[in-house]
Amino acid sequence: MKIIYIGPLLWLLGSGGSAHGARPFVTDDARLTTAGSCQLESWTRLNRASKPSARSEEFWAFPACNPSGNFEVTLGAALGRPLQGPQSKDYVVQAKTLFRTLSPGNWALGLAAGKVFHPEINPGPNQFGNSYFYLPWSYASEDERWVMHVNLGGLRDQASKNNRLTWGSGVEWKINERWLGISELFGDTSGGRYWQIGLRYSIMPDLLQVDSSLGRPFGAAATDLQSLALPYGPARWISFGLRFTPASIF
């Protein structure tokens, strides 16, 4: 069977936030990088499909800056290395703003839109076509021990001229001062549905964090992905990430 090649930015999954959610989320939050500063999120994902020929590795870097206070710009890149076939490089540019900021016992709402650059665009669990947008909504508990996130959006695949609606829902909960847990579901109207759970640990609170996550498709998506040799459509994945979030740069 010929291997269908799909770039790594087209399925995730953190960038969320930014184009993925704050690591290790795929579902984005209605928050921005600290005003007057930048942050860097980088991670490696190991895709472990049931067929060895469909396994792959991904390497990601997503710097984001917020120079004005309510306008965040993200420039991201990913390198995908399948076990068989050529490697892929993908790039994304995204802008994000908030209509309402998050506070304890209250909700926030924003808008994000972006463009993915890759010669072969094919949306997958990362919720990307050539162009995309989404509305991130978040709600924080009074004590901020947990925060809920919901995303609704759409994507336009320029190659197939198809439009798809995308969705995501997740919860982050504060275990203690250094540990944070996450769980989420996300997918699109093509039938793709995925779950992911993860942990984040603060080496230096509010500055340097490491994380890890585990996820896989479920329902029709799980059946479809196990029956095809897709380098970026695995039955399951595990990822390891690093976040650098300084309080001020500019």
Segments (PLM) and residue ranges:
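N-terminal signal peptide c-region/cleavage motif recognized by signal peptidases
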Residues: 14-16
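Sec-dependent signal peptide recognition
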Residues: 1-11
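Transmembrane beta-barrel domains of Gram-negative outer membranes and organellar outer membranes
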Residues: 19-250
